[in-house]
Design a protein with these regions (language model features):
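Histidine/lysine/aspartate-rich catalytic loop segments that bind and position anionic ligands
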Residues: 94, 98-144
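Catalytic cores of alpha/beta
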Residues: 35, 80-90, 123-131, 168-184
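Hydrophobic faces of well-ordered beta-strands that scaffold small-molecule active sites
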Residues: 20-24, 47-49, 73-76, 95-96, ...
């Protein structure tokens, strides 16, 4: 199935519309593929395959070829330029990093790919913006107070598009969105390692559906949104 080339603006918009980036960490290629199918079945057409997954580049390449037309496939835990280049060549439509590395942003810029660097403090957020980051991952957000921390960051940075990651779950997802999060990065609370290992994909699909509902509940109905 042909993959539609998306602009950075398209990817940013889709991330915001979906509101959730599932972070897939798996012990094998097979587990990663099963996780993606379970997540998509739950109504979340976007995944972040981390570099900690065995043969992550091959997983990304295969997913892009098989599901890239209807699922946004990204690469996570990208920490250096070499990884970034490999992910782009594999077809990753966005890159996510746990921290801020200028070389990763540079590779993404050359290839016209969205990169979502990690930051935690206001200074790190400002540095990311200065380097051209349009969307920033706030990690590990849970250790800083969760939704309250996002609300605090949005006060001096009202236009920042923030994706809290770490400590995000169905119980606080709506609160994060209400606090001003652009989207949410969700890992173990969605992709349950035991369920994946045991083949209990229904648990992951159900968790995805609950997250989708939680995010939707915190957003105004489409009919209430003002058109620009």
């Amino acid at each position: 199935m042909p993959v539609t080339e998306l602009s950075i603006e398209d990817v940013i918009r889709r991330v915001g519309e979906i509101g959730i980036i599932p972070v897939v960490r798996a012990a094998s290629v097979e587990e990663a593929n099963r996780a993606v199918e379970a997540i998509c079945a739950g109504g979340i057409p976007i995944v972040e395959i981390t570099m900690t997954v065995p043969n992550a580049i091959s997983v990304i390449r295969e997913l892009v070829q098989r599901r890239g037309a209807d699922v946004l496939i990204g690469a996570g835990t990208v920490t250096n330029a070499e990884q970034a280049e490999s992910c782009v060549r594999a077809g990753a439509q966005f890159l996510v990093s746990p921290g801020l590395t200028a070389s990763v942003l540079s590779v993404a810029r050359v290839h016209d790919r969205l990169v979502i660097p990690g930051a935690l403090t206001p200074t790190e957020l400002m540095n990311a913006q200065e380097l051209g980051a349009r969307v920033v991952k706030i990690f590990p957000c849970g250790s800083m107070g969760g939704p309250k921390y996002i609300k605090s960051l949005k006060a001096p940075f009202p236009h920042a598009q923030l994706i809290p990651t770490g400590g995000v779950n169905a119980g606080n997802a709506a609160e994060f969105i209400a606090a001003g999060a652009y989207a949410l990065g969700v890992g173990a609370d969605l992709v349950d390692a035991a369920a994946l290992r045991e083949g209990n994909l229904g648990k992951i699909t159900s968790a995805a559906k609950v997250l989708v509902q939680a995010v939707a509940s915190a957003r105004p109905a489409k009919s209430d949104k003002k058109t620009n």
